[in-house]
From Swiss-Prot:
One GO CC term on file: membrane
Gene transcribed to yield this protein: U26
Phylogenetic lineage: Viruses, Duplodnaviria, Heunggongvirae, Peploviricota, Herviviricetes
Localization per record: Membrane
Protein name: Protein U26
InterPro entries: Herpes_U26 (IPR009980)
Organism: Human herpesvirus 6A (strain GS) (HHV-6 variant A)
Pfam families named among the record's database cross-references: Herpes_U26
Keyword terms, alphabetized: Membrane, Transmembrane, Transmembrane helix
Parts of the chain that traverse the membrane: 31-51, 66-86, 103-123, 131-151, 183-203, 218-238, 243-263, 274-294
Length: 295
């Protein structure tokens, strides 16, 4: 029961932390130079978190306070808002990285993690926009309180013994890189299709919660190239007939393609000397950047 609860808590926090969501919203109406600065900040924050880091020495209360205070002050003078934005994106990246690693290390239940993500995403819908700060805080509070006990559990400590840093791996160039090429090529294909679809299907400003739900799916796998082909057909159909249904179909197939990549990556690389959690986090952050930037 405790393992099930911990899995749900991890999912609740993962659904609440979407790196760049609020930061990209703060760039609406800004100059191209300002938007480029945001992209550079996001890239630097991700690279700084993609490093060897022992989750046992992490205390989530610091990032919880930064995220909470940053979301409470969205309308500030430009200089102060830039500082808030930088602090927020760094905390979101670090928190998401830790959560991704913990899900890979712990013997967690994928359906429970997915359920937690679904609950968080539901409360991020537009009908709850006025309570977004409170909802985010409520979603992050359980992991903030529970984290200390979670990392001292026997399951976590046993899993941590298998979770070796990529830089210390002797087989990285021989095995892991070959596996990585396949996933990277598939991801770049879908990423390109997502970018093209975003430009030509005139996606409205929204939270894209349906798309994020499909991306986080853990129940269905689809051949990535079939998903890409169906997404391209949806783009062409949407260009010929301006119907909202084709945008939904497009998001569904692209999302299923991304989720299939992540599910295959988790099963293939989980027990190898590779930071699979970091790679999953990197893929997710790139998808979020493509979907939300410039909307």
């Amino acid at each position: 029961m405790r393992r099930l609860t911990d899995s749900f808590i991890l999912g609740l926090a993962k659904g609440a932390v979407i790196p760049g969501l609020y930061t990209f919203r703060m760039t609406e109406g800004r100059s191209p130079l300002g938007q480029i600065g945001v992209l550079i900040t996001v890239a630097i924050s991700f690279l700084l978190t993609f490093k060897r880091f022992d989750p046992r020495f992490y205390k989530p209360i610091g990032d919880f306070k930064i995220v909470f205070l940053s979301l409470m002050a969205p309308k500030l003078p430009s200089l102060l808002s830039a500082v808030v934005m930088i602090c927020l994106i760094f905390s979101e990246m670090r928190l998401r990285m830790i959560l991704s690693r913990c899900v890979m290390i712990m013997p967690s239940y994928s359906p429970a993690v997915f359920t937690g993500i679904m609950v968080s995403l539901f409360f991020k819908s537009q009908m709850f926009d006025d309570y977004s700060v409170l909802i985010t805080a409520a979603s992050l509070l359980p992991i903030t309180v529970r984290y200390g006990w979670m990392i001292r559990s026997s399951g976590f400590l046993l899993g941590l013994q298998k979770y070796r840093p990529i830089l210390k791996s002797t087989s990285f160039r021989e095995v892991d890189l070959k596996c990585l090429v396949k996933f990277t090529v598939e991801f770049l294909l879908l990423f390109t299709i997502l970018w093209i679809g975003k430009m030509f299907l005139s996606m409205p400003k929204s939270n894209h919660l349906f798309f994020l739900t499909v991306v986080n799916n853990v129940f269905f796998k689809l051949n990535v190239f079939k998903a890409a082909a169906c997404a391209v057909v949806a783009i062409l159909s949407g260009l010929m007939m301006n119907v909202c249904l084709y945008r939904i179909i497009f998001e569904a197939f692209v999302g299923l393609g991304f989720s299939s990549i992540m599910l295959n990556l988790s099963s293939d690389l989980k027990d190898r000397s590779f930071y699979a959690g970091d790679l999953l986090n990197g893929f997710f952050c790139l998808v979020v950047c493509c979907m939300y930037f410039g909307v």
